[in-house]
Amino acid sequence: MDLAANEISIYDKLSETVDLVRQTGHQCGMSEKAIEKFIRQLLEKNEPQRPPPQYPLLIVVYKVLATLGLILLTAYFVIQPFSPLAPEPVLSGAHTWRSLIHHIRLMSLPIAKKYMSENKGVPLHGGDEDRPFPDFDPWWTNDCEQNESEPIPANCTGCAQKHLKVMLLEDAPRKFERLHPLVIKTGKPLLEEEIQHFLCQYPEATEGFSEGFFAKWWRCFPERWFPFPYPWRRPLNRSQMLRELFPVFTHLPFPKDASLNKCSFLHPEPVVGSKMHKMPDLFIIGSGEAMLQLIPPFQCRRHCQSVAMPIEPGDIGYVDTTHWKVYVIARGVQPLVICDGTAFSEL
């Protein structure tokens, strides 16, 4: 109303000004055409300008969206350094063929025989290269050249006298032995839903799982608003994480302070055995297939046996790392999900 009244008053004043200009023009002897031209120029210069229409609600919506976009962009750049690295790029067609030809050439080498997935056993020593795993025995160790009369050093007794035990869940020991390596076949792999839940709840305890920013946020949104690692989060209860992801540990003889470090997503290598992943004393196969290798210290190799055995989803392994070096090799077609931790709080 005020704007309309203001415009009316302006036009009234302009009308009075036009009449005054017309009278003055006639008095000065100007022609009618010259007077009209002068009035037209006057009106064009003094025409009131109507301000553009304003939509306050739309402006508020624009500001809110711009603020949210800025917050998400800032959060992304803050989180990105703490996110796991993306997997290696897929090889092009030319690289794939070159890798295949290189793989075929390597198959003829003697060292390649011990990593061949077609063999049921993994030979680790000299003349036993062609020795397969027995069908009834899930693991195999190589024969070491040991002199019975030669005394065993004190730091080699752990690997020389405590051999790897492979057992079913119902046969698991009731008492935990620190020096005794063992593999417990639970037959309980991680389901995809359990892995996804773990990724949402504990993103800082994962490695190698690559997923887009918004895809991960959308998948975890109802359960968790911010499913990404951030530095100001309080320390995780890793013992609780272990038993939450693997409830079977409540029935096993491991110490109560056994904890979970991280879960990793590993791709099988084009050349079987070309990449070995070092493990701590406690590890669990969530999904996929792998080969376990236990190698004694160099000074103990005359008294201790190297061990190699295939492990499968649901297998729980424990090895005292003071007497063994523990390695896992991803094999097969499916990616390997493996979780590692420790049975002792001091590690």
Swiss-Prot record:
Q: How is it modified after translation?
A: Glycosylated.
TM helices/strands, residue ranges? 59-79
Question: Topological domains (Extracellular): residue ranges?
Answer: 80-347
GO cellular component entries = cytoplasm; Golgi membrane; midbody; nucleolus; plasma membrane
Ranges in the Cytoplasmic compartment?
1-58
What biological processes does GO assign it?
A: autophagy; chromatin remodeling; collagen metabolic process; connective tissue replacement; epithelial cell proliferation; fibroblast proliferation; positive regulation of cell cycle; response to bleomycin
InterPro entries in the record, alphabetically? BRAP
Is this entry keyworded Ribonucleoprotein? no
Q: What UniProt keywords apply to this chain's record, in alphabetical order?
A: Cytoplasm, Glycoprotein, Golgi apparatus, Membrane, Nucleus, Signal-anchor, Transmembrane, Transmembrane helix
Top-level taxon in the UniProt lineage: Eukaryota
Task: Give the free-text miscellaneous remark of the entry.
Answer: Named amfion, after 'the 4 Amfion heroes in Greek mythology and their deeds in different locations within the mother land.
| Functional description taken from the UniProt entry | Exhibits histone deacetylase (HDAC) enhancer properties. May play a role in cell cycle progression and wound repair of bronchial epithelial cells.
Assembly information from the UniProt record: Homodimer. Interacts with BRS3. Interacts (via N-terminus) with SIN3B.
Q: What's the protein called, per UniProt?
A: Bombesin receptor-activated protein C6orf89
- Source organism per entry reads Homo sapiens (Human)
Taxonomic lineage of the native organism: Eukaryota, Metazoa, Chordata, Craniata, Vertebrata
